[in-house]
Structures are given as C-alpha cells and as structure tokens.
Swiss-Prot record:
<dbReference type="Pfam" id="PF04587">
    <property type="entry name" value="ADP_PFK_GK"/>
</dbReference>
<dbReference type="GO" id="GO:0006096">
    <property type="term" value="P:glycolytic process"/>
</dbReference>
<keyword id="KW-0313">Glucose metabolism</keyword>
<dbReference type="InterPro" id="IPR031299">
    <property type="entry name" value="GlkA"/>
</dbReference>
<feature type="binding site">
    <location>
        <position position="298"/>
    </location>
    <ligand>
        <name>Mg(2+)</name>
    </ligand>
</feature>
<dbReference type="GO" id="GO:0043843">
    <property type="term" value="F:ADP-specific glucokinase activity"/>
</dbReference>
<dbReference type="GO" id="GO:0006006">
    <property type="term" value="P:glucose metabolic process"/>
</dbReference>
<keyword id="KW-0460">Magnesium</keyword>
<protein>
    <recommendedName>
        <fullName>ADP-dependent glucose/glucosamine kinase</fullName>
        <ecNumber>2.7.1.-</ecNumber>
        <ecNumber>2.7.1.147</ecNumber>
    </recommendedName>
</protein>
<keyword id="KW-0963">Cytoplasm</keyword>
<dbReference type="InterPro" id="IPR007666">
    <property type="entry name" value="ADP_PFK/GK"/>
</dbReference>
<feature type="binding site">
    <location>
        <position position="37"/>
    </location>
    <ligand>
        <name>D-glucose</name>
    </ligand>
</feature>
<keyword id="KW-0808">Transferase</keyword>
<feature type="binding site">
    <location>
        <position position="269"/>
    </location>
    <ligand>
        <name>Mg(2+)</name>
    </ligand>
</feature>
<feature type="binding site">
    <location>
        <begin position="345"/>
        <end position="346"/>
    </location>
    <ligand>
        <name>ADP</name>
    </ligand>
</feature>
<comment type="similarity">
    <text>Belongs to the ADP-dependent glucokinase family.</text>
</comment>
<feature type="binding site">
    <location>
        <begin position="115"/>
        <end position="116"/>
    </location>
    <ligand>
        <name>D-glucose</name>
    </ligand>
</feature>
C-alpha cells in the first residue's frame, strides 16, 4: 500500500533542525579548485550568426561528440550545442590562445565566484558562518574581491609561520583564472535544436586549475592546515588528463592519508571527467574517501569505466534519471569502492546510500534541496535565513512519481528504506521553473548535505 508522505512538513522540520545545528561545525577544509566565472546568457540570433560565420557543418560535428579539449572556435560552438541539445552540463579546457581571446571578446553578462572550492567557501563560510580554509590556486585582486565576508581563510607564510587570513588580506598580483559559462534556459532554440531543460557549457581559460596546481603552503604544511578542520571536501580532479594526472593524484592520495590519520571525514565532489584513465584513477581513490557526491551524467560515466556500459546507458536514457538503474549504479559503486556515503542528485529528486542509518540523512538532503531551490530562485543566497524562502517553492511532480516507484520497490517510509546493509534515503526536490542561474547548484546541494548531516549526527 502506498502512503502519501507529508513532505512539506518534513521540509520545515528539517530546516528547523539544521538551523539549530549547522554552526556547531568547527571547520571545513576545501581543496583544490577556485576560479572566476564569466557568465554569458546565450541569445539565439547571436549564436546562430557565430555558427554560420565559422562553418555550420564543422560546428555540428562537435554537437554529436565532445572533443577532449577545445583548440578551435568550431569546437567551442559545437560543444555549446552539445549541451543545449541534451540539456546537460559539460566543461572543457580551452587550450588555444585564439579561442580564449575569442571568448574574451564575446564578453560576459556577469562575473561571479567560480570553482567548486570558491562557491562552497562563500556558501559555508559566508552564508552558514562555518569556518572554512580554502585552496585558491591564484589569488588575483579580482579573485579575492569575489569572496564574501565571514570566516573564510587562506593559509599564508609569515616569517616561516603559517597564518590564516581572509583572501582579501592576501598579497595581490597573481593571475586571473577565468571560466566562461554559456547559460541557456529550458526550451532555448538554436538552429533546429531545443534545450529539454536549462543548463550550461563551460570553457575554462585557466592554466592552474586544469592541472590541479597546488600551492606550496598546502604541500609543505598540509597536516597543520588539516588539524584546524573537522571535515574536508575535495574537488577539482575532473580536468586532469592521462598525460598530466600522475603527480596530482599522488599528492591527493598523500593528503587523503593525512586526513584519514586525523579522523577527518573527506567528501569527494565529483564533476564530469572526460578522460577515462583519470576517471578510473578517481574511482580507485574513492576507498580513501568517506563520501562522494555526483549527478546522473557523472554516475553513468563512473559505472561505464567500471565495465557497466549498458547500466550507464540506462541511467541517462530517461529524464528524470531512471531511479532503479541509478540505485543499481550506486550499489555497485559503494560495494566496489568501500566509500561509506553516496549522495546522488538529479533533476526532481535526490538519493543517499549510506552505511550510517537515521533520519538525519534525510533531513540533510531536505535542507540541501531548500538551499538549491533558494539559490535557483534568487541567483544567490545571502544569509542562512534566506533558505526559508525555499519552502515556498513547490515540490516537482517528477520526484513524486519517482517516490511511487521506490515505495513499491523498496518499501520506503517517509523517504527511508534499506537495501542490503545500507540505508536508502530518497527525497523529491523543490523545482524552480525558471531558475536565475544553474551554476554552482550541484556544489550547493552536496556541500549543504554533507556538512548539515555531520552537524545533525
């Protein structure tokens, strides 16, 4: 028998609990990727003119299959079309100076904090008031100006001593790392393509984040930095390639050993990783992490390199992502890697597969969904109390349909059930029909859930 869950009431209670607990977290270490986001809202006429000018046939080639990196203008425009056609996000490194100059001249509508670390530092430190220590590969004046006020710190050496200071107090003069983000709304039309939902394509004009450049303070004094945290969130491994991944992955492994020795729970925030060799290396690293966060494209890409091509196809063939295929993928991932917590987010619903059991897992997911809805609605969250506004956003129909499937299959009760030795947690999310922006929503979801779950436990 299917019972109707009172999700609105659960949302409100979860928010009350997290508001009371979240500031108890004493510190979060965030590494490694921070940059500047230059956001351009795409216009049909402008994009079509650009496509015609460089040659439509050549551009369309790349709308079928993404290149590994961007070396030409047709590759840039074709990759943007790839995202529009599927309503899926993608990010590629722009290696050519000519294409970087083309993007700079194309311009932007707004500049924002970018990179998973930068976005999470502003949210956790600037909005939630939790002390964070952020890795910033290049602290230019513009980069520093994008950090919010609050307990956000970067390590620096002073007379051989390690000090933590706000990024705006840092010595200036380093380079700008700019990622150009091409945003499109749902039903955006270009040529004969129509976007099934809002999303974006990212072209990275950046010589530091893509090679996982790590600052000397973080190489020489990592243990000292880590001791000032209770939790760690690691991100930024996704642009690495078969040619350059050896040294950075080795360093990440060393950092994880220190975190594990100190008993600090580390979460990996996954992002789409085009290089399959690197993707497999990241899967091997998962046994050193407590937790991982990913969406349907990322999950499919992971199970694919684990040898499950047909399962990968099933995960992404439907919209919203097929929950039965997703759970099969999550189960494979948790069993084969030994990670203790997986948080899956997609349009309409979130799932968690965890060794830990309890309502706090669901409450953390609900809080993170409110944070995401608020960010989508407002473009930015300025203070913790803003998240109450997310309560007014309606729950999406897609998620409620998925709930019926999962209740039948796994006997969920108020979103909680079990599968083998794990707790399976489900929530339907609140869906903003016309979001102001989609950038950073995944990072908002994962960091809010990971940190609030820890604070509630």
């Amino acid at each position: 028998m299917i019972t109707m869950t009172n999700w609105e009431s659960l949302y409100e209670k979860a928010l009350d609990k997290v508001e009371a607990s979240i500031r108890k977290v004493r510190g979060v270490l965030l590494a490694y990727n921070t940059n500047i986001d230059a956001i351009k809202y795409l216009k049909r006429e402008d994009l079509e003119k650009r496509i015609e000018k460089v040659g439509k046939e050549e551009v369309l080639r790349y709308s079928e299959e993404l290149p590994k990196e961007i070396e030409t203008i047709p590759q840039l425009l074709g990759s943007i079309l790839w995202s529009i056609k599927r309503g899926k996000a993608a990010e590629l490194l722009v290696v050519s100076r000519e294409v970087r100059e083309y993007m700079r001249k194309w311009g932007w509508d707004e500049l924002r904090m970018g990179g998973q670390v930068g976005i999470m530092a502003n949210l956790l430190g600037g909005v939630y008031g939790i002390p964070v220590i952020a890795h910033v590969p290049q602290l230019s004046e513009l980069q520093a100006s994008l950090f919010l006020d609050g307990p956000i710190y970067v390590p620096t050496f002073e007379r051989g001593e390690l000090r933590l200071i706000h990024p705006r107090e840092f010595r200036k003069g380093e380079e700008d790392c700019i990622h150009y983000i091409y945003e499109f709304p749902r039903n955006f039309k270009v040529l004969d393509f129509e976007a099934p939902r809002e999303n974006r394509f990212i072209g990275a004009a950046d010589d530091y984040n893509p090679i996982l450049y790590v600052r000397e303070e973080w190489i020489e004094r990592f243990e000292e930095i880590a001791k000032r945290s209770e939790l760690a969130i690691i991100s930024g491994l996704h642009p690495l390639t078969q040619e350059n991944h050896g040294k950075p992955i080795k360093l990440v492994r060393e950092h994880l050993k220190i975190l594990n020795d100190l008993g600090i729970r580390a979460h990996l925030e996954f992002a789409f990783t085009p290089d399959e060799v690197v993707r497999l290396e990241i899967v091997k690293l998962l046994k050193h992490f407590y937790s991982v966060g990913l969406n349907e494209v990322e999950l499919a890409s992971v199970v694919s390199v684990m040898g499950e091509k047909e399962l990968a196809e099933r995960i992404i063939s439907k919209d919203p992502a097929d929950p039965i295929a997703v759970i099969e993928g999550l189960l494979k991932l948790i069993k084969e890697t030994g990670v203790k917590r997986i948080h899956f987010h997609t349009y309409g619903y979130y799932l968690a597969l965890t060794r830990e059991k309890g309502e706090h897992v669901r409450d953390a997911l609900l809080f993170s969904a409110l944070a995401a809805a608020t960010k989508a609605m407002k473009g930015n969250i300025e203070k913790l109390s803003d998240i109450r506004e997310g309560l007014a956003v309606p729950i999406g129909e897609q998620g409620l349909e998925v709930e019926k499937i999962l209740e039948k299959e796994f006997s969920l009760r108020d979103g909680i059930g079990s599968i083998e030795d794990y707790q399976l947690t489900f929530i339907p999310t609140k869906v903003v029909k016309k979001p102001k922006s989609t950038v950073g929503i995944g990072d908002t979801i994962s960091s809010s859930a990971f940190v609030s779950e820890f604070s509630l436990h």
